[in-house]
């Protein structure tokens, strides 16, 4: 800010008014007590700043502020000279401030033109600053836009992951439910298969090629059952009480009946050729039977009447009711088939009392047979093959990956309420009643002589069916029961005595197990 020039001031016109006023003020001898040149003439001194500000500054400038005067000096390039004594901690006694400029010299007023005011390029600085700031703002906006795009991308990815997570959780829940249902189905299948295995274990299932009794051919192995029951009779009194009155008319299964031999009936599934059996009797008894395969059963010839065993037989019981060893399954199955009234003749085989092997019979005699219904080998084999094929197909379907199961149908099919033990089996009381009916006498007993003289002796019919029956466990049967006195005591003793010689008869040797073992046929499974 230029001040008006004081009195006595003169200078070129291009010199700033502040410099002109300063030159006049320093050169005025009236103000030497407050401001004057230095002895060298290169600078000037301000002796008392307070008094100078009050008395001198208002005369030349429009203010009395010492700080403003110093700021103007600095704007024109004047610098404050600092002495050594002024740089200490102790305040100097004299208030003296010295300012100097290279072009402000005593006696050289023309140099004032060289003193220029410092021009501050405010506009340039502002434009550069604004440019820098604009670049920074642009870069910042670019970064913000990039960050915003990344944030939107992350939001979209997060939303997609959220949807995928929800879908995965729904799939996991569905898979868990399907897994639980499949576990239930598998458990039902396992229970069903276990029940089948248990039922097959209880049933007396035979091999594919069981034995048929033949006359003179090579002996076959005995039929194999799930449980082996001995067919030997017990000599002497048994552990069971006396039979009920329903058994009084027959000596079959009587504990005190003494016999050594008799016809043996065994069910077979294949008819093997054998030599015909001749007998001195008449023709074969032709009675109506169901359409079933026939099985040949060897019949012993009548023995001479002077046998001591025949004479020692009980006179109260006819010889036609002599005990005959039968298979328990054959007997019970044949009884259960008797739901319809069918004429069944009582078995009246003759007893071989000679204690010797039977004499050879003439080959020209007519063949005598007993008709027994039995399963055919091919039917049984086809049935077993079909069961194996069904089990293999079931296993293949369960192990395949693309197999879908209707759980509702399977759960209804394999419910625990439908098991093998729930099958409708014949009641024990009705079975026992049928046994008593069968064992009751069908006709009045005839004397021994009339039985021997009858031409139809030894031609009785036995009705048999191959229906499977669940056998009872001998250990679970009460020993004191008198309903079935012989079914579970067959294995306690030998049917034939040790003194009898039946080594030549293959049929009796098969029942006693005295025949030497033979080489196993490789075709027999």
From Swiss-Prot:
Residues 272-283 have a biased composition (Low complexity). The modification Phosphoserine is found at residues 121, 230, 275, 292, 303, 307, 314, 319-320, 327, 346, 359, 415, 440. Residues 380-405 are annotated as: Hydrophobic repeat HR-C. It comes from the Eukaryota. GO terms for cellular component: centrosome; cytoplasm; kinetochore; mitotic spindle pole; nuclear stress granule; nucleoplasm; nucleus; perinuclear region of cytoplasm. PROSITE patterns: HSF_DOMAIN. One of its GO terms (biological process) is cellular response to sodium arsenite. The modification N-acetylmethionine is found at residue 1. Keywords: Acetylation, Activator, Centromere, Chromosome, Cytoplasm, Cytoskeleton, DNA damage, DNA repair, DNA-binding, Isopeptide bond, Kinetochore, mRNA processing, mRNA transport, Nucleus, Phosphoprotein, Stress response, Transcription, Transcription regulation, Transport, Ubl conjugation. InterPro entries: HSF_DNA-bd, Vert_HSTF_C, WH-like_DNA-bd_sf, WH_DNA-bd_sf. Phosphorylated. Phosphorylated in unstressed cells; this phosphorylation is constitutive and implicated in the repression of HSF1 transcriptional activity. Phosphorylated on Ser-121 by MAPKAPK2; this phosphorylation promotes interaction with HSP90 proteins and inhibits HSF1 homotrimerization, DNA-binding and transactivation activities. Phosphorylation on Ser-303 by GSK3B/GSK3-beta and on Ser-307 by MAPK3 within the regulatory domain is involved in the repression of HSF1 transcriptional activity and occurs in a RAF1-dependent manner. Sumoylated with SUMO1 and SUMO2 upon heat shock in a ERK2-dependent manner. Sumoylated by SUMO1 on Lys-298; sumoylation occurs upon heat shock and promotes its localization to nuclear stress bodies and DNA-binding activity. Phosphorylation on Ser-303 and Ser-307 is probably a prerequisite for sumoylation. There is a cross-link at residues 91, 131, 208, 224, 298 (Glycyl lysine isopeptide (Lys-Gly) (interchain with G-Cter in SUMO2)). Residues 15-120 are annotated as: DNA-binding domain. Residues 367-525 are annotated as: Transactivation domain. The modification N6-acetyllysine is found at residues 80, 91, 118, 150, 188, 208, 298, 520. Residues 266-365, 495-525 are annotated as: Disordered. There is a cross-link at residue 298 (Glycyl lysine isopeptide (Lys-Gly) (interchain with G-Cter in SUMO)). Pfam families: HSF_DNA-bind (PF00447), Vert_HS_TF (PF06546). Residues 221-310 are annotated as: Regulatory domain. A motif (9aaTAD) lies at residues 408-416. Monomer; cytoplasmic latent and transcriptionally inactive monomeric form in unstressed cells. Homotrimer; in response to stress, such as heat shock, homotrimerizes and translocates into the nucleus, binds to heat shock element (HSE) sequences in promoter of heat shock protein (HSP) genes and acquires transcriptional ability. Interacts (via monomeric form) with FKBP4; this interaction occurs in unstressed cells. Belongs to the HSF family. This is Heat shock factor protein 1. It comes from Bos taurus. The gene is HSF1.
């Amino acid at each position: 800010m230029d001040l008006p020039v004081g009195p006595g001031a003169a200078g070129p016109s291009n010199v700033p008014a502040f410099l002109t006023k300063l030159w006049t003020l320093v050169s005025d001898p009236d103000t030497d007590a407050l401001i004057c040149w230095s002895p060298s003439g290169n600078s000037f001194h301000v002796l008392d700043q307070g008094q100078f500000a009050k008395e001198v500054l208002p005369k030349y400038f429009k203010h009395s502020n010492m700080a403003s005067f110093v700021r103007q000096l600095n704007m024109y390039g004047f610098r404050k000279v600092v002495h050594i004594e002024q740089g200490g901690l102790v305040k100097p006694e004299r208030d003296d401030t010295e300012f100097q400029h290279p072009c402000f010299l005593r006696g050289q007023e023309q140099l004032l033109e060289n003193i220029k005011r410092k021009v501050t390029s405010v506009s340039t600085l502002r434009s550069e600053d604004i440019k820098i700031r604009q670049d920074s703002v642009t870069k910042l906006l670019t970064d913000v836009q990039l960050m915003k795009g990344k944030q939107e991308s992350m939001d979209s990815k997060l939303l997609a992951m959220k949807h995928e997570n929800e879908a995965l959780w729904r799939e996991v829940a569905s898979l868990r439910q399907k897994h639980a249902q499949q576990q239930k189905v598998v458990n039902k299948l396992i229970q069903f298969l276990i029940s089948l295995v248990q039922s097959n274990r209880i049933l007396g299932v035979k091999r594919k090629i069981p034995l048929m009794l033949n006359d003179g051919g090579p002996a076959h192995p005995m039929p194999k059952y799930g449980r082996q029951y001995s067919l030997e009779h017990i000599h002497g009194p048994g552990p069971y009480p006396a039979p009920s009155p329903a058994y009084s008319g027959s000596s079959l299964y009587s504990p005190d009946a003494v016999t050594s031999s008799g016809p043996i009936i065994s069910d077979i599934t294949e008819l093997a050729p054998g030599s015909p059996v001749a007998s001195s009797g008449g023709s074969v008894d032709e009675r109506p039977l169901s359409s079933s395969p026939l099985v040949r059963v060897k019949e012993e010839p009548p023995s001479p009447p002077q046998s001591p065993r025949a004479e020692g037989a009980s006179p109260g019981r006819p010889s036609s009711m002599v005990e005959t060893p039968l298979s328990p399954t054959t007997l019970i199955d044949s009884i259960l088939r008797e739901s319809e009234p069918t004429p069944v003749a009582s078995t009246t085989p003759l007893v071989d009392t000679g204690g010797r092997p039977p004499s050879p019979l003439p080959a020209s005699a007519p063949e005598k047979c007993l008709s027994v219904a039995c399963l055919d080998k091919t039917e049984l084999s086809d049935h077993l093959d079909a069961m194996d094929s069904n089990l293999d197909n079931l296993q293949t379907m369960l192990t395949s990956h693309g197999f879908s199961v209707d759980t509702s149908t399977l759960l209804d099919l394999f419910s625990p309420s439908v098991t093998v033990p729930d099958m409708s089996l014949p009641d024990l009381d009705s079975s026992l009643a049928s046994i008593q009916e069968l064992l009751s006498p069908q006709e009045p007993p005839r004397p021994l002589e009339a039985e021997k003289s009858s031409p139809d002796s030894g031609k009785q019919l036995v009705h048999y069916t191959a229906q499977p029956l669940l056998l009872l466990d001998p250990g679970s049967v009460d020993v004191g029961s008198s309903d079935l006195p012989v079914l579970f005591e067959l294995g306690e003793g030998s049917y034939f005595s040790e003194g009898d010689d039946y080594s030549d008869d293959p049929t009796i040797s098969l029942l006693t197990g005295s025949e030497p073992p033979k080489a196993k046929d490789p075709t027999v499974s």
